[in-house]
């Protein structure tokens, strides 16, 4: 279950980073 929590955490960070990049580009 630990790896699932890690993946979910990484996914959230990646999502925030992607949104930040999109906002910067736009």
UniProtKB/Swiss-Prot annotation:
GO terms for cellular component: extracellular region. Has antimicrobial activity. The keyword Amino-acid biosynthesis does not apply. Belongs to the frog skin active peptide (FSAP) family. Dermaseptin subfamily. Its main location: secreted. The modification Valine amide is found at residue 26. One of its GO terms (biological process) is defense response to bacterium. It is found in: Secreted. Signal peptide: none annotated. Pfam families: DD_K (PF12121). This is Dermaseptin-J3. Expressed by the skin glands. InterPro entries: Dermaseptin_dom. The keyword ATP-binding does not apply. Keywords: Amidation, Amphibian defense peptide, Antibiotic, Antimicrobial, Secreted.
